[in-house]
Curated annotation (Swiss-Prot):
An MF annotation (GO) of this entry: tRNA binding
Protein name from the UniProt record: Large ribosomal subunit protein uL16
Function: Binds 23S rRNA and is also seen to make contacts with the A and possibly P site tRNAs.
Coiled-coil portions: none
Organism: Magnetococcus marinus (strain ATCC BAA-1437 / JCM 17883 / MC-1)
PROSITE patterns linked: RIBOSOMAL_L16_1
Amino acid sequence: MLQPKKTKFRKAHKGRVHGLAYRGSSLSFGQFGLKAMATARITARQIEAARRAMTRHIKRGGRVWIRIFPDVPVSQKPAEVRQGKGKGSPEFWIARVKPGRILYEMEGVDEQLAREAMQRAAAKLPVKTKFIVREGG
């Protein structure tokens, strides 16, 4: 699963995700893409599950790019522990996603197969998405 090799700080504030994505909002590598239509916090496990669903559907054909990276640690306290006594330890990593962000890109397969693969991937993600195709050739 994806996670940073090294971070400046061990724990992060929860924060809020506001606004639209301007960076990473257009296709850079592939012919087809999956674009987020809403704000979301996507975990490393969800990113990997969607990637697996996609690559298994296209079998050996094509190439897939993951355009998001989980760089925010989320801390949790253990079950049945009283409040207080400091913040919990980091348990998993998330990527904060804004509307308009490209999540995955794909090339080397026909559009129908790419659309089906992206639909399978979208089913694994906690955000409404849209299938997009590169304009002009």
